[in-house]
Amino acid sequence: MKLLVSVFAAMAAFAADAPPRIVYTKSFPGSSPAYVSITVEKDGRLVYKEAVDDENPIKLQLAPADAEAIFAVVEKLDRFKRPLESGLKVANMGLKTFRFEQGQQVHETKFNYTQDSDGALLLDWFERVVETEQLFINLERAVRFDKLGVNQALLRLEAWWDRKRIVAEKQFLPLLDRVRKNESYLHMARQRAAALSDAFRGGAPKATQ
């Protein structure tokens, strides 16, 4: 009996020490993308998917301060132990799920619309991630297959950067450097890529600003 108690105590201690993660999903058939899943680890590793069985997820690294800020908001939300749904009669904006995992500890809450200020703040951050990865996918496609469309893709990226909507901007650097150094792209595209590359290397606003 004492052995079983010791085993359970050890398992509980391991679960408490396990690194936490946050999982956000949104299902909204008819929208683009119709489904997203974003997993954020405590150390800032992030995985973005547009299908449950996505074979080519986007993986990136958040700045430590950004990851810390996001997990701080999750703590304010009591690790999703309480409901966030407003209950108001509003239009369908997609089923969102916030999920907290740490060892055997799992909490999640689902909602269409929330009036909770911290819940809305966290949702807005995840929406920024979705917007950012859509811009990344668009730019990557243009760089590879549509050189004349690169400048337009960069204009959109620049606009979102000016609005402080970009998350983990350094993920764009390999693409931007490829454009700025390659004379086969339009001169204006190369100039814009160089300017964005310099700006992204200079830092960005905090995740929850």
Residue map of PLM features:
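Hydrophobic h-region of N-terminal signal peptides that target proteins for export
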Residues: V5-A16
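Short, well-ordered, aromatic-rich surface patches in folded extracellular/luminal domains
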Residues: A16-F28, F80-Q209
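Short, solvent-exposed loop/hinge segments that bridge or flank secondary-structure elements
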Residues: G30-E41
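Short, mixed charged/polar active-site loops
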Residues: Y35, E55-P57, V106-E108
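Short beta-strand/loop motifs in extracellular/secreted proteins, especially
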Residues: V36, G44, K96
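N-terminal, post-signal-peptide region of Sec/Tat-exported proteins
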Residues: T39-V73
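Charged, amphipathic alpha-helical segments
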Residues: D66-G87
